[in-house]
Curated annotation (Swiss-Prot):
Catalyzes the attachment of valine to tRNA(Val). As ValRS can inadvertently accommodate and process structurally similar amino acids such as threonine, to avoid such errors, it has a 'posttransfer' editing activity that hydrolyzes mischarged Thr-tRNA(Val) in a tRNA-dependent manner. ATP binds at residue 575. Belongs to the class-I aminoacyl-tRNA synthetase family. ValS type 2 subfamily. The keyword Protein biosynthesis applies. The gene is valS. This is Valine--tRNA ligase.
């Protein structure tokens, strides 16, 4: 039921000129009350109010008194949140808006709960996407390394500015003043490099030569966590390999362009078709290379012909076989994805071109049996959605962090972290179990953290001096003239670090692991890691692994993993689908608070569609709260009302409902079930407080009834406090107008409800009130009468119900404009109404 101001204050001529004492002032009539209400705008203007409070929150005064993490405070419990440092793309998408809202909500709730909260915000600044923007959009060549780096930093700062403004517009208030960090800055870079040197000293880092995952499109090495299988269209070529002693064997391959790198043919030892061929020599067609036929249990008999070629390297299985059988290595793909070392047959061609040409050559020479078009899984660069290109395996000298021999320890230690939802722990466990490679941390890029090492031709590493950090080996002389192990000349490592090296030390940076052991001991492990499902195997795993190695403990006690925000059609947002929604598209129409509420309206960990209709519904709820606050404003504003010795029975009922709401809401917050907070708020505030209770107490408010005034003030204040973490702007505004005892809601405490007595009979009374009101309203609607039309009512109900109604008969009558209420005992509950003869209102 929508509030009407005039209906609220004119329910009866009896009260038209009633003197009402409000806040020490005498309001003589409804005109005075109307005038008082006009101090409060009728319509909630989210843009105006939100921008006002965002400016206030950013003031030095509010930072100092409300949002500052108090390093000196040894009494209050600490709550440290490790928030995601987003890559500085410049666009704050809906996924960013989601975790920003979650982080801000948790930070605000924990402050209300009495915690000393550290809510930081960093920026993951370095990496390939920025390089590509600078290289192609700005036209800056990579040849001039210094200029290129400078332009990358300028671009980064420009993007940070845009994203930060968008975050602030959504009401996000981390501690920008002291805990905003950028991964390219010297202070942070020093921590990165120090952590790498420490891991080197722990014998966890080494340089070695071998096959690496390589993205020809991005021209850099990759880690296992950055690749995955994508279904793509391809071919399966059936090729005849002549046998040296006569005869032939037909193999099936998806990579005929790698024939020149073939080192063996493999068949399954249980495959009767090829048992007599194992150990024989076959000739690679076109290239006439002699290779041995071997048997291996990993060959799938059902795939193709059951015979496969082993090349260096077509896929991860080729690498395993090469190591297992100590096969020769021949590299025929370069860093740009072009064919080399084929005696000019395919040299210079890109992979796809070489594949097509090889098919034609095999066909011409009579070696091609057939070609099938297939769909198959291809290992690709999936960590970057704007790449998704197939990867190759090149032989390179790279720097690795040893992970494989720590897998068992990792599988034991991860259980010390609590996951929300609990099922997310299995994603991390499965990833740890699936790791097959050590972590290649070198990237052949420019805009990244320099690896603080020099190396010699034998692959020995020499770390920088810690007092020289942060350093760039390209610009700095090595700490020694020669390699201390072999006496060879030292060269700087020119590659930069994997970007996950940067972001995997966020916890160590925030808790001052290297700077202040006292602070570290009081803030580590962090209380909470907040992140999405898509970076469990990267940011979560690498932070967990590195922190465990360096600090000998898990990085955080709880991991909160949110799902993905989908397009309105329920599919992943994509520009090609046209279903991309920006959080700022309609923020001025509906407000940041309504957007935040819509984003938190799903269970943590679940994917959900974002729809503006849901946002619109949330704004309606906020307008309802605004209206209710405005309506009670003349009666309770800025008053300190003590609990009366005796409460009206209707007030006792609503306080029992209030106790249930407060208890459920706080419990939901504690469990990060924000959707339950909103669900309980709607059920309690909209359906009970606004639609029932406010209607029932208005006559008592005009009577200056302390029980009604105390109760509604307590209810509104507690609702404001409990809604504040999710909808901070409107709650600050209402609080400042209605209460204002403190400069911010955040300086209040969570509501306490232990003093509210619980009585089963009063609960029953409440249910009877709601049902009776509903019956009378329904009859009025059925008879096309307005809610303000005076009526006579006959209510048929059981003896028990009648006894309860008699306790609140006067309240029911005044609430629903009932001039005469006749209670008739009956087994059937129903209502009969007729229009009253006398006027009941203005």
């Amino acid at each position: 039921m929508l509030f009407s101001l005039r209906n609220f204050i004119s329910y009866s001529n009896l009260y038209l000129y009633k003197n009402v004492c409000i806040g020490g002032q005498l309001l003589l009539n409804q005109d005075e009350i109307l005038k008082k209400m006009e101090e409060w705008p009728k319509h909630y203007n989210p843009k105006e109010i939100e921008e006002k409070w965002q400016k206030i929150w950013l003031s030095e005064e509010y930072w100092r008194d409300v949002f500052r993490f108090r390093d000196e405070d040894d009494k209050a419990p600490r709550f440290v949140i490790d928030t995601p440092p987003p890559f500085t793309s410049g666009e704050l998408h809906m996924g960013h808006a989601y975790w920003v809202t979650i982080a801000d909500t948790i930070g605000r709730f924990k402050r209300l709960e009495g915690y000393n909260v550290l809510l930081p915000q960093g920026w993951d600044t370095q990496g390939l996407p920025t390089e590509l923007k600078v290289q192609y959009k700005l036209g800056i060549p990579k040849d001039n390394r210094q200029l290129f780096l400078q332009k990358c930093i300028e671009w980064t700062e420009e993007m940070i500015k845009k994203m930060k403004e968008a975050m602030i517009r959504l009401g996000y208030r981390p501690e920008w003043e002291r805990f905003e960090y950028k991964t390219y800055e010297p202070k942070y870079r020093k921590i990165i490099q120090k952590s790498l040197i420490d891991m080197y000293k722990m014998n966890l880092i080494e340089m070695r030569e071998g096959p690496v995952i390589w993205c020809p499109k991005c021209e850099t090495a990759l880690a296992q966590s950055e690749v995955g299988y994508l279904e793509k269209e391809g071919i399966l070529a059936y090729i005849k390999f002549p046998l040296k002693e006569g005869g032939e064997i037909v193999i099936a391959t998806t990579r005929p362009e790698l024939l020149a790198a073939t080192q063996a043919i493999a068949v399954n030892p249980m495959d009767e078709r090829y048992k007599n061929l194992v150990g024989k020599i076959a000739l690679v067609p076109i290239f006439n290379i002699e290779v041995k036929i071997i048997s291996d249990a990993d060959v799938e008999k059902e795939f193709g012909t059951g015979a496969v070629m082993i090349s260096t390297y077509g896929d991860p299985q080729d690498i395993k076989w090469q190591l297992k059988y100590n096969l020769p290595i021949k590299v025929i793909v370069d860093e740009k994805g072009r064919i080399i070392n084929t005696n000019g047959i395919l040299d210079g061609l890109k992979i796809e071109q070489a594949r097509n040409k090889m098919i034609e050559l095999l066909k011409t020479k009579g070696y091609l049996v057939k070609v099938e078009k297939i769909k198959h899984n291809v290992l690709s660069h999936v960590e970057r959605s704007d790449c998704l290109s197939p990867v190759e395996f090149l032989v390179k000298k790279q720097i690795y962090i040893k992970v494989l021999d720590k897998k068992q320890k990792l599988l034991e230690e991860y259980k010390k972290m609590k996951f929300k939802p609990a099922r997310m722990s299995y994603y991390l466990e499965d990833w740890i179990k699936s790791i097959e490679w050590d972590w290649n941390i070198t990237r052949q890029r420019i805009y990244g953290t320099p690896l603080p090492f020099w190396y010699c031709e034998n692959g020995h590493l020499v770390p920088a001096k810690e007092e020289d950090l942060p350093i760039d080996p390209i610009k700095t002389s090595p700490p020694l003239e020669k390699c201390p192990l072999c006496g060879s000349e030292l060269k700087p490592v020119t590659d930069v670090a994997d970007v996950w090296i940067d972001s995997s030390v966020t916890v160590l940076y925030l808790t001052k692991f290297y700077e202040d052991k006292n602070v570290f001991n009081r803030t580590f492990p962090a209380s909470l890691r907040l992140q999405g499902t898509d970076i469990i195997r990267t940011w979560l795993f690498y932070t967990f692994f590195r922190t465990l190695m360096l600090a000998n403990n898990v990085p955080f006690t709880t991991v909160l993993v949110n799902g993905q925000v989908l397009g309105p059609d329920g599919t992943r947002m994509s520009k090609s689908k046209g279903n991309v929604v920006s959080p700022l598209d309609r923020v001025n129409d509906f407000g940041a608070d309504a957007i935040r509420m819509a984003l938190l309206d799903a269970s943590i960990g679940d994917d959900f569609p974002f729809k503006w209709d849901i946002v619109k519904g949330k704004k309606m709820l906020l307008q309802k709260l605004w209206n209710a606050s405005r309506l009670v404003y003349p009666f309770i504003a800025k008053q300190r009302l003590d609990k009366p010795k005796s409460l009206h029975i209707v007030d006792k009922w609503i306080l029992q409902e209030h106790k249930k709401f407060v208890t459920k809401a706080i419990n939901a917050y504690e469990n990060y079930d924000f959707y339950l907070v909103l669900q309980e708020l709607y059920n309690y505030f909209w359906e009970i407080v606004a639609d029932e209770y406010l209607e029932m107490i208005k006559h008592r408010l005009f009577d200056d009834d302390n029980s009604a005034k105390y109760t509604i003030q307590r209810i509104i204040r507690d609702i404001i406090i409990l809604l504040h973490p999710i909808a901070p702007h409107i709650t600050e505004e209402i609080y400042s107008r209605l209460f204002g005892h403190k400069k911010s809601v955040l300086l209040e405490e969570l509501p306490k409800v232990d003093d509210i007595e619980e009585n089963k009979r009063i609960d029953e009374l409440g249910e009877v009130i709601k049902k009776t009101n509903s019956l009378i309203r329904s009859e009025k609607i059925k008879n096309r009468l307005s809610m303000n039309t005076p009526v006579s009512v006959k209510l048929y109900a059981s003896k028990q119900v009648i006894e309860l109604i008699n306790e609140v008969k006067d309240d029911v009558m005044k609430t629903l404009k009932v001039t005469n209420l006749e209670l008739i005992e009956s087994n059937e509950e129903k209502v009969e109404i007729k229009t009253a003869n006398q006027s009941m209102g203005v």
